[in-house]
């Protein structure tokens, strides 16, 4: 079997969740002895069978960026005030490469930044799998619809602009012609696909993203400390609005002063000077590129704060649990999937920051109880390994490829 992945970036260092997940899948397939190729616009680390298109240094690459960035950026100067991908421009050189590789499956990952033209994608002759890292393929413009239900009920001249109707119809034609299989990393995102007008005729399988085997619980990595370590991390850290740091701030403000004094907030994914957040000492760890270094942080922390507003899975949540770290999350989109409330962490109602603070207090009490135990952390790690083990997930993906 030969598989070709298509995505915007390749690599695991500060590239975003979709690129990290796709890179790990590519590497895992290669390790299993399956011929896997990765086609991307930007290669951010060395890798086997990675193809950068349009070719670096070529005139075609310059034209590609001029056209895609120009078309996407034009909308910033209109009433939309933001970039809007149109996916009109083809990825130069893709047809020639696919004819040479002759894949059995093309696995489409994150193409939101005009990576590939929809017409070009529709003409791929082999089986196509689309990974729902977000809802870009089945929504109108935004990667997450929020409260907008038009992706379920449809667009009309009364509820949508010409641009929205045009984009929606292009995606509808693409999916109907391509008839892809959807893989979503959570039940929530697959349910969204099944309910959507664009994706309701396609099969959708809920299969988690593959997580690096470096993430596992190691008691010897636990540091002896007299602080309560709250870990938070995301691409761009606090500045990423979808990760919900504002809600975490509110929850921290509700902690008793005694707990604030004995707590530290560690933030990875952002470079900044150390400070205090609502009375809690805050330490910035920058971009953590190595999975083993990130696993060390998970093992050293006492709780992982996961206040995300919208997620199709939330890889940091799973990485934390594989390292035996309890997670506190809001029950919104797929943020809480995989957490067993009161056993492997705490799930609180969407936006209930007071309950989020209570979860932090409960874990604080557990850590500083008279007889703290590793039993909970072992239980979390074991359960996460059962749910998110690399071998089991890869086998499920291969079943989809072969079906």
Predicted regions and their residues:
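Aromatic "clamp/platform" in nucleotide-sugar-dependent glycosyltransferases that forms part
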Residues: 309
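Short hydrophobic beta-strand element within catalytic cores of glycosyltransferases
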Residues: 326-329, 339
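Nucleotide-activated donor-binding/catalytic signature segment of Leloir-type glycosyltransferases, i.e.
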Residues: 269-292
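A charged, aromatic-enriched C-terminal amphipathic alpha-helix characteristic of glycosyltransferases
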Residues: 371-401
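Conserved donor-binding/catalytic core segment of Leloir-type glycosyltransferases
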Residues: 222-243, 249-252
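Conserved acidic donor-binding segment of nucleotide-sugar-dependent glycosyltransferases
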Residues: 341-342, 346-353, 362-368
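Membrane-proximal helix-turn-helix segments that form the acceptor-binding/catalytic region
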Residues: 96, 136, 148-182, 195-200
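Short alpha-helical donor nucleotide-sugar binding micro-motif in glycosyltransferases
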Residues: 296-301
